[in-house]
Swiss-Prot record:
Belongs to the non-disulfide-bridged peptide (NDBP) superfamily. Short antimicrobial peptide (group 4) family. One of its GO terms (biological process) is killing of cells of another organism. Amphipathic peptide which inhibits the growth of Gram-positive bacteria. It is found in: Secreted; Target cell membrane. Keywords: Amidation, Antibiotic, Antimicrobial, Antiviral protein, Cleavage on pair of basic residues, Cytolysis, Membrane, Secreted, Signal, Target cell membrane, Target membrane, Toxin. It comes from Heterometrus petersii (Asian forest scorpion). The modification Phenylalanine amide is found at residue 36. Expressed by the venom gland. This peptide has a significant inhibitory effect on hepatitis C virus (HCV) infection (IC(50)=7.62 ug/ml). Furthermore, this peptide potently inhibits HCV before viral entry into cells and kills HCV rapidly in vitro. Its main location: secreted. Residues 40-68 form a propeptide. This is Peptide Hp1090. Residues 1-23 form the signal peptide.
Length: 68
């Protein structure tokens, strides 16, 4: 009975390790595909649009109001 229980626990641990490693490999592979795919490269350009280098007078006034 002890041997069967030990084999059961070892099998359970091995199945758990296999399922977690499969999920990790899928996440790594999807990350690689998103970096080199056309959609992945176009999605990286969205960050450039979020930064606006120009600061308007309204922005300066708002910052001055916050600092008071």
């Amino acid at each position: 009975m002890k041997t069967q229980f030990a084999i059961f626990l070892i099998t359970l641990v091995l199945f758990q390790m296999f399922s977690q490693s499969d999920a990790i490999f899928k996440a790594i592979w999807s990350g690689i595909k998103s970096l080199f795919g056309k959609r992945g490269l176009s999605d990286l350009d969205d960050l450039d649009e979020s930064f606006d280098g120009e600061v308007s007078q309204a922005d300066i006034d708002f910052l001055k109001e916050l600092m008071q």
